[in-house]
C-alpha cells in the first residue's frame, strides 16, 4: 500500500507537518538527512499564531516551559562587548509587553523566546510517543509522479530504496531537493548581503551580564562585531558574525577554535571558558517558489519561501503553511473532500507568502521601522508601507474556493482587526471560560448567535460541532462556519430559509464535493 503522505525534511516545519497530519489521523512518514532534530537553533521568535497551533496539538505547555522569560527585559540591546553591557554601557529597546488589545486577540503566548532546537525536540518527542514513522539519516534522492501517486527514491543508513506515496510534502529547506526535482524555480531578490556564520556556544555569561537580559544584542567591538542572541539567557547563546568572502574568508575557515576566540572578543573576556557546540554558515535570502504545489507534491516552509530574518516571520509563515495544508490532506485522505480542495493550498498561501516577504524586506531596508515604538514610529511605518507585526502574523486573509464570499481586503495594516470576515482567522472570545479558538480547534464548527437556535439544530443535522455565542462580531440570528484551521469559511448575518441545506451546500463548495468514487 502507498504511504498516504511522505514529509521530506525534519526541521520545525516538517516536524509540525507530520504532527498535524498525525493529529488529523493521517499516517505519514517523515525523512530527514540528519541523524535527529537539529541542535542548532536558526530562529527563536515563535509567533502568536504558531503558539495557537501548538496549543491545538497539546504542545503549548511543554514549549512554554522551555521558553526564556524575558518580561521586563530588553528586546534589543546595543553594546561594545558583553562586559561593557553588564557595566551599564548599553543602549536598549524594551521587550514590548502584550497590550490589552493584543490579549483580546489571542490569549495564548509564550513567556518569552524559545529557541528552535527546543521546539523541535518537543515535537519530535511527541511524534515518537505517538509511534510516528520518523526516518532519520535518510535523504530524498529523486521523485517522479503520475496520476495516482508519487514514486520517491530515498537513501538511508542501509542504502537506497524506493517508496510509493499518495502525496508528498516537501519541507526540505531553501535548497529543496524536491523543488529542484519538480523543476520549480524561485523569484525574488535572492541572496541578501554578506555570508554569515552562526556560532552556537555554551558559556556562563551571567557574571558579566550582572542581571541584564535581552533577546538580541548587537556587539559593536571592531574585533568581533555581530549579533548575540539568547537561547537560555544564561549559558547557551548564538553569535552571528559576517564571513568576509570579499576579503578571502571562507566558511570553513571558522573552525571551533577560531569561533571560540571570536566569542571571547565579543564578550570582552580573554579567559572565558567557551564550548563551541555547532557552527553553521548561512546567507540572508528573500525568495519564493514559482508554485507551491505541483500535482501531488506540496512545498511548505523554506522550500516554498525564504524570508529575510528581521520580523521573525520565516519560521512562523512555514508553520502556517503546514496548518493550512494538513487538514486538507486529511479531509481528502478520509474521503470527506474532493481533491480539488488541495488546489486551495497554493491559492491561499502564495499571496500570504508574497505579502510576508514584502513586509520582511521593508523592515530590512530600515530596521528602525521594526524596532521603533510610539506614535512617531507608527507614522513612519505607515508612510513606508510597513504593517504592524500582529497584522502579518494573524491578520492576513484567504481568498479561494474554500471560502464563501471572501473579504481579502485588510481593514487596517496598523491595527489587527479580526471581525469574523470570511477568509480571516476566527476572533477570540471567552465563552463560559473557554476561548473560541479552543472551541473550533481541528474540526468544522458552527458558531451561532444568541438567537441562532435554527442554526444549532441544522448543525446537529449535518454533523457539525456547534456553539451559541454572544459576541459583538456576530448578529443574534447569524452564524459563522469555521474550518478546522480556524479560518472562517462562511458568515451568515441572518437565518436561512433551510439552514441545514444551506450548510450542506456551503460544505460541498468548500470541500470540493461530491467526491468522485475514484477520488484519492
Residue spans for each PLM region:
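Glycine-rich FAD pyrophosphate-binding loop
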Residues: 22-43
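Conserved mid-domain beta->alpha element of the FAD-binding
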Residues: 8-18, 23, 54, 123, ...
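C-terminal helical "tail/cap" subdomain of flavin- and related membrane-associated enzymes
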Residues: 330-444, 449-457, 461, 490-494, ...
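A conserved short coil-to-beta-strand element within the FAD-binding core of flavoproteins
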Residues: 136-151
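Active-site-adjacent segment of FAD-dependent monooxygenases/related oxidoreductases
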Residues: 42, 46-126, 220
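Conserved FAD-binding catalytic core of PHBH/FMO-like flavoproteins
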Residues: 125, 167, 171-284
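Glycine-rich Rossmann-fold phosphate-binding loop(s) that bind the pyrophosphate
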Residues: 9-11, 33, 116
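Core beta-strand elements of the Rossmann-like FAD/NAD(P) dinucleotide-binding domain
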Residues: 158-167
